[in-house]
Amino acid sequence: MGLLDSEPGSVLNVVSTALNDTVEFYRWTWSIADKRVENWPLMQSPWPTLSISTLYLLFVWLGPKWMKDREPFQMRLVLIIYNFGMVLLNLFIFRELFMGSYNAGYSYICQSVDYSNNVHEVRIAAALWWYFVSKGVEYLDTVFFILRKKNNQVSFLHVYHHCTMFTLWWIGIKWVAGGQAFFGAQLNSFIHVIMYSYYGLTAFGPWIQKYLWWKRYLTMLQLIQFHVTIGHTALSLYTDCPFPKWMHWALIAYAISFIFLFLNFYIRTYKEPKKPKAGKTAMNGISANGVSKSEKQLMIENGKKQKNGKAKGD
């Protein structure tokens, strides 16, 4: 007998039981959350984080439509300040995690979460909270792309990376603000110091961009980061580290998704043969010296005619 053939009372009982189990599970998960962070900003409830992420996705959808008939914003100074501000923020996070884990005697192989109010543990938890906040601030990367009409930069990889990092790290801070969680955040914040340094330098304009030949190595660094994260997490599973197993497996799956996406980006950007462009220094159909391509072609053709002493049709 199927569920649809059951008596109304029994169906209601099944639904009621399922709802009660869900509520009990929710209460249980809340009971094992990290008490140290429960009153920190954004940590009382998931709704502020989910609301910010929803607004972000709405802007990704509506922003390009709003900018369609508008001139792109000129944001050089804003970008310089923002990018070097992110360098300082990530440097602060890296330093706090490194010093906190060092003083707490953390192991890079296996480290359980200490939920005590030990000064070093609270320092690590606070640094991880700042790391979570930094992922929310990074939504501005996308906002600036859209306001500058660089919509080609707002790829699936870009949106997936930004949206999931901020949203999922709320879970990390709520339940495991310490222990093994420090390693990935420490590694990622270090890479972001390098990454935002590059972006900050590019914001100065073309005169410095010729010295920034190392852009492709940023993607390689990120790919190495994901492989190191998987290896570190797999080692923790192998040693039966007393850290939530579900989070270990979730982290491995998450890192694998990034490897596929970043590898695809790297191949398309640096390995596939590029289509020939109309002119290396051309900007919107006009070359660097202000002469359009069609005018240049006519000048070349006229020069050939004069060299031969007569026009082609004479």
Swiss-Prot record:
Its main location: endoplasmic reticulum. The chain crosses the membrane at residues 42-62, 78-98, 127-147, 165-185, 188-208, 217-237, 247-267. The keyword Nuclease does not apply. It comes from the Eukaryota. It catalyses: a very-long-chain acyl-CoA + malonyl-CoA + H(+) = a very-long-chain 3-oxoacyl-CoA + CO2 + CoA; tetracosanoyl-CoA + malonyl-CoA + H(+) = 3-oxohexacosanoyl-CoA + CO2 + CoA; hexacosanoyl-CoA + malonyl-CoA + H(+) = 3-oxooctacosanyol-CoA + CO2 + CoA; octacosanoyl-CoA + malonyl-CoA + H(+) = 3-oxo-triacontanoyl-CoA + CO2 + CoA. Residues 305-314 have a biased composition (Basic residues). Its EC number is 2.3.1.199. GO terms for cellular component: endoplasmic reticulum; endoplasmic reticulum membrane. One of its GO terms (biological process) is fatty acid elongation, saturated fatty acid. It is a multi-pass membrane protein. Glycans are attached at N20. One of its GO terms (molecular function) is G protein-coupled photoreceptor activity. Residues 293-304 have a biased composition (Basic and acidic residues). Oligomer. Catalyzes the first and rate-limiting reaction of the four reactions that constitute the long-chain fatty acids elongation cycle. This endoplasmic reticulum-bound enzymatic process allows the addition of 2 carbons to the chain of long- and very long-chain fatty acids (VLCFAs) per cycle. Condensing enzyme that catalyzes the synthesis of very long chain saturated (VLC-SFA) and polyunsaturated (PUFA) fatty acids that are involved in multiple biological processes as precursors of membrane lipids and lipid mediators. May play a critical role in early brain and skin development. It is linked to Stargardt disease 3: A common hereditary macular degeneration. It is characterized by decreased central vision, atrophy of the macula and underlying retinal pigment epithelium, and frequent presence of prominent flecks in the posterior pole of the retina. The C-terminal di-lysine motif confers endoplasmic reticulum localization. This is Very long chain fatty acid elongase 4. The gene is ELOVL4.
